[in-house]
């Protein structure tokens, strides 16, 4: 399991600790990841994802998991999140076709 947000793609960064004397030592900046259970309204299921705190704020800002995944680009999502996105698109298309018929 990599230290990467499944929704935003936020991952580990590498930089330096810089002392007062300007000595530099390598360090890693780890993302603030949390195991979160998010509910899909369209699919009617709960999904457990590893999401950064900033990613969770983005999900809430966009109005939930479904809205976030529909607006997100595929290249920043994890494989599992891409699958969820495709399922949501398929389900909404089926619902729209049922209403039209």
UniProtKB/Swiss-Prot annotation:
Pfam families: Ribosomal_L28. Coiled coil: none annotated. Keywords: Ribonucleoprotein, Ribosomal protein. The keyword Ribosomal protein applies. GO terms for cellular component: cytosolic large ribosomal subunit. The keyword Ribosomal protein applies. It comes from the Bacteria. GO terms for biological process: translation. GO terms for molecular function: structural constituent of ribosome. HAMAP family: Ribosomal_bL28. PANTHER family: 39S RIBOSOMAL PROTEIN L28, MITOCHONDRIAL, LARGE RIBOSOMAL SUBUNIT PROTEIN BL28M. Belongs to the bacterial ribosomal protein bL28 family. This is Large ribosomal subunit protein bL28. It comes from Rhizobium rhizogenes (strain K84 / ATCC BAA-868) (Agrobacterium radiobacter).
């Amino acid at each position: 399991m990599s230290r990467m947000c499944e929704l935003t793609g936020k991952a580990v960064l590498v930089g330096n600790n810089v002392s007062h004397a300007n000595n530099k030592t390598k360090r890693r900046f780890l993302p603030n990841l949390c195991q979160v259970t998010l509910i899909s309204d369209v699919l009617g299921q709960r999904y457990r994802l590893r999401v950064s705190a900033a990613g969770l704020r983005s999900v809430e800002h966009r109005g939930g998991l479904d809205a976030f995944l529909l607006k997100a680009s595929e290249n920043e999502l994890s494989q599992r999140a891409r699958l969820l996105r495709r399922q949501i698109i398929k389900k909404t298309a089926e619902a729209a076709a049922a209403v039209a018929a």
